[in-house]
Amino acid sequence: MVTAPPEIRSLNGTLRVSLSLRSASGAGGETRYCYVDEHGNLNPTLRLKPGDLLVLKLKNDLSSVPGTMNRRDPPKRDPCASWKMQIASTNLHFHGLMVPPVCHQDDVLNTTLLPQSPAYEYRVRIPANQPPGLYWYHPHPHGHSEEQVLGGASGALIIEGVERFNASVVGLPERLLIFRDQARANAAPVDGRKAPSKDLSVNFVPVPFPDYEPAIIKIKPLQRELWRVLNASADTFVDVHLLTNGRWQNLGLVSVDGVPLRYEQNESKASADGDSTEWVPNVLIPPGGRAEFLYDSPAEGGWTQLLAAGVDTVPVQDEDTPGFVALPGFTPADDDDYTPPRWMVKITARADAPLPASVLPKTVSSVRALLAPLASVYPTRTRKLYFSEKVMDAKNPRGSTVFYLTEEGHVPTAFDPSAAPNITVRQGEVEDWIIENRSQEVHTFHIHQTHFVLLERDKEAVKENYLRDSVDVPYWDGLSKQYPSVKLRIDFRGAAVVGTFPYHCHILQHEDGGMMGTIQVLAAGEKRSK
C-alpha cells in the first residue's frame, strides 16, 4: 500500500529540521542511503511558502561505505572549502530553488561534509517569487552522486501556493508520488524475459522484476486530486500513462518542474478565475524532473493503472542496418541499459478509502508581479553546447566511459573541480543555448539556480506554456544527418543566480563520469576577471 511520506511544514515563516544521512547494507549487498530527521522520520517532505526561511542541519553519519570506518576524531577542516569529493562525503542540493549558490545555501561545488564532521547548517530563504510547486533535495558530491541517490537519499520539497495560478486545483486533495530507481544485484533473465537495468519503487514500495507486482492506492470514487509526481531516480526515465477501466485516460497537466503552466502570464492578480490546465495523454519525466497533474478517479469499484512506459535510451539499430554509423563503444539497445514498460501502481475506487491528509486551500491570495515572460525577451547571445562520450578502450565497449558536456569550439574535457568556470555571463542577461546530443544514448540537460523555456526541438519550434529546469535530449540514431538538439532560453535575470554553479546531465552516472560544466554569473556591476 502506498502511503504519503512524512511531512514537515514551516511555522511562523520558518521550517527547522535536522537530518542525518545514514547508510546500511541491503539484502543484495548494495548500499542503501536515507535521510532521518530528529523524530525518526525517513526522507521527510519539506513544505514551505514563498518568503519562508529553511534552517536545515545536516549530519553525515554514513557508516556502510568505504572510507567511513575506523575514524576516531572528527576531521578538522572547513566544510565550505574546496575539497576533493570522496565516496563517504556528502552535501545537499535544493533542486529547482532559485537561491544563491553559496556556502550554507545551495553550493555543491565546494561544500563537502565528511563522516563524523559536526552538523552543518543550511539557511535558505525561499524567494518571494519562487514558483509554487514540487521541488526536491538530494546529495550532490561530484563523482558519487549516483551512488547516494540510487541508494535512496532524496526527499520532496513543496512550495505552497499553486492554487493561486490555477482555479482548477483550489480546494483539491493532493497526493505525492516519488519514483526512485535501485540497482539490481542480479541482471539475469527470468523465463526468457530480460531484466531491467534498475528496479523502480513508488514511495519506497518496490515494484521489482520479474513480476512487477504494482503498488496499491485506494481512492474515493469520482474524486479529483492533484497528483505531484517526482522522478527522484538517479538514471531512469518515467513515462507516465493512466489506464482506467481498460481505456487510456488523459492527465490534466498543472505544473512542470515546480512551475505552474502559464506562470509568467499571471503578472498582477490571482488566476482563480482561470484554468491553465492542459490535458495530455502522458508525461515523460526525466531523472530529476517533476510533473503535477489532475487525476479523476472512476466510480465505485473502478480501477486505474499507472504505467511507466518503456523508454529507448540508445538506438534500436545495429551495425547491420544500412547506413548506420556506430560510434566507438556503441552497443545495441538489447545489450545496454534497459527500461521496459512496468505497471507501477493500481488505483482502486472505494467509498471507504481515506482522503489524502493534505488539501489545497479554498481561498486564494494575490500574486506578485513577475518579470517579463522569458520567451519574449531578446537574448543577449546564443551558445551551442553538445553532449559526447569517449570509451577509454575501444576494444572493450563495456569498459570505462568518459562523458563530456562541451561548448562548441572548445576541446571536450571531463569536469575538473579545480578548473575555471566554463562560461561567464552577467546577472540581468538572457541567453539562448542550443544543446546537441552527439552520442548514441539519451541525456538530460539540467542547470542549477534558474529555469529556462524550451523554444525548439531538432530546429522545429515548440510552444510550451511553462518553464523547466531539466529537459531530455534524445540520442543520435547513427542515421540522421543532423544531431538531435534542443534550443533553450535561459534566465539569468534573478539576483539569486550571482555566483558559480553547475550545469550537467541529470543522468547521474553521466554527471559523475564528467558530463558537467560550471557557469559564473557576475553581479550587474562586477568586472570580468582577466
Where on the chain are the PLM-derived regions?
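Extracytoplasmic/periplasmic copper-protein system
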Residues: 7-9, 155-172, 178, 330-335, ...
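Short, surface-exposed loop/turn segments at beta-strand-coil junctions that are enriched for proline
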Residues: 125-131, 296-302, 493-498
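Hydrophobic or amphipathic alpha-helical targeting/insertion segments
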Residues: 127-165
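N-terminal, post-signal-peptide metal-ligating segments of extracellular/periplasmic oxidoreductases
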Residues: 1-114, 119-121, 192-227, 232, ...
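Active-site pocket scaffolds in enzymes
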Residues: 28, 79-114, 249-281, 325-328, ...
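Short strand-edge motifs at loop-to-beta-strand transitions and within beta-strands
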Residues: 118-124, 215, 281, 289-293, ...
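Histidine- and aromatic-rich segments of cupredoxin/plastocyanin-like copper-binding domains
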Residues: 99-115, 183-363, 460-462
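Short acidic/polar inter-strand loop motif in beta-rich domains
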Residues: 143-149, 310-321, 509-515
